[in-house]
Amino acid sequence: MKRTGRQKDIVTPEKKQEQRELLRLFSANIRKILKNTDLLADDLQEIRLRTGAPLLVVAKDQEYFLTPDGALTGEWEKGYPVSPTDIRDTMDYIGSFSLYAYEDELRQGFLTVEGGHRIGIAGKTVIEGEKVKSISHISCINVRVAHEKKGCADRVMPYLWEDGRFLHTLIVSAPGCGKTTMLRDIIRQISDGESPYPGLTVGVVDERSEIAGCYLGVAQNDVGIRTDVLDCC
């Protein structure tokens, strides 16, 4: 993903690697479009593919359509139309050509991939005994790009301790305001220990892989050195 000269972002080797990992999830056509856009992975929040609909991205809380040459537009008619082949190839890349290995996660309508990115899917659902048995003929893919904001909990941490004891804490906000991001950083700081607070053993029950973003059982997000995660339970 390139940047125009109007921005002076410093792209580290680590960031370049993250961008390459993200691009590898997509079909060749969409990968090319994303490479040509002037958005960095840090800007992107979601990349949405729907069969027959224009390619759509969410960046900095704004929706944009992407044209075939990677330009951002607010006019949906100019957006690149996602084809069934784009969907099929993208799912092949997401599942490393072994989607059967992700059947349990796919039944929930999402899976987590390397890097902590979460992939939501929609298609034909087969119900058995009031539970989803499988999802096939996938026609919609939503990639939620993983982001960490280390230090975002710095200002609240002093209020979460009393007499050397961590207090019961409830985080409340409107949707999309960063509750999970804040919680992840709180967990990291409790686990690592941040002066004057000692590091503590932390157990995380990550029902939808939103906090640790586990891939093959390993947390892709930094949740601290003393943290154990129960994923997808």
Can you annotate each of these PLM segments?
Residues 47, 121, 206:
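Residue-level signature of catalytic and energy-coupling elements of molecular machines
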Residues 182, 186:
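Hydrophobic positions on the alpha1 helix immediately C-terminal to the Walker A/P-loop
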Residues 89, 97-166:
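P-loop NTP-binding catalytic core
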Residues 169-171:
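Hydrophobic anchor at the beta1->P-loop junction of P-loop NTPases
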Residues 191-233:
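P-loop NTPase switch/communication element
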Residues 1-114:
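N-terminal accessory targeting/assembly segments
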Residues 179:
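Conserved lysine of the Walker
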Residues 175:
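The conserved Walker
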